Amino acid sequence: MKKFLPAILWSTLYFSISNASLASLPPNNQLVEDQSTGFSVQPGFEVDLVYKVDNSKYGSWIAMAFDHKGRLVVSDQDKAGTFIIDLPPVGETLQESMIKKLPLESSWRGMLFAFDHLYMCAQNRVVRVPVSPEGEFGEMEKLFDQGPGGEHGPHSLIVTEDGKGLYLVAGNFSKNPPFEKSRIRTNWKDDVLLENYAYGHNGNGKAPGGWVLKFNPDGTERELINMGYRNPVDFALNRDGEMFVYDADMEWDIGAPWYRPTRVNHGVSGGENGWRATSKKWRKYFPDSVGSVVDIGPGCPTGVIAGTKAIFPTFYRDALYLCDWTFATLYSLHLKPQGSSYKAETRTFLTNTKGSLSLTDIDIGKDGHMYFCVGGRRQQSYLYRVRYVGSNTTVLSNLDTTSVHAQARKARHMLESYHGKENPDAVEAAWPYLKSSDHHLRYAARIALEWQN
């Protein structure tokens, strides 16, 4: 049987864990105006307009990804196409000759270079294209079909924490994911004691809602990891290898007791976040809901990226970055361990107080600068670059592997290893954690027990 720390230990330590996580962050500086763009940005950063897109030729960009040579691939939302760009150095102008159209159709929602391929998802399928060391693209291969979902369908792809597979996130219009295995018992029901208030937008929507799927690089062994989101357009892993999902609100619910603001969820194994149509939504305090690490408020989540590869100050390299399409804001998300999970604080990293800034996607270039694109729904598109020009150290912080927080996460991972299958050791290992003061340890233990007969 796997070794595990007694649950009573975590109950004893939880108070100190929670208090330790309240340590203050560095001061939240007042934003300054960027002289080039007029945007408001954190001190020490400058913003460059790299390219104002000719929409008649290149469309309105909604997805982007960097290849191993530092080239940027972007996709129009409609039929203009998919393009590859040789970005010029800082201070030089992007010429139209640097933009080339790829034979890859259009309207890709998410793109990722990994495992010597370009992976892409659209509203009805996931595909990959081989990419040679010289940067040449081969023939497109469909990995699997996924039912149509439009702007609430399959969205984004990332590499798994062990570097061996991929995750796909999708919104609540997607059909049930084509999985062969699941970390969640697939016995979800929509029965209720009292009739629900039904209205308007997706009024008949049912579980599982939005979800995260794991699969091998060749598209096989698809496994449902977590679910219950509304419309999470993007997600990312932090430096601990933990998943965080940026989920949307339902703006028609504002003012209702079942309103759930845009928020960031910890995408744990077996996680159920309880999105249901209209008044059926689970509240975050329900014991069988994972809950959020931070609630943000009204907005429209789009791109997410970890700052790890950016040449940014240490504090910002540890952050995640969240794009809000509606409110012209790029947030930095600062995670602090709390038991076996986290809590978080969001700060405005960049915004445009003088006009629109419909952020659609974001990535870190090979040069260590941050790039984001603006567009969507046939709006005028732009490509911007964010550079750090200050004097603070940009060295990565040391990973925490020994604190009570790290040990609590290790205990949760042990419990999660029993998800999705029967194991004769599971009951003895998980049962003591049902009385833990740590919600996420209790949650992981319950899911482990639900899989045992």
Tell where the protein language model's regions lie, with residue ranges.
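Positions within the helices of HEAT/ARM-like alpha-solenoid repeats
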Residues: 426, 437-442
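Amphipathic alpha-helical scaffolding segments comprising HEAT/armadillo-like alpha-solenoid repeats
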Residues: 396-399, 423-432, 453
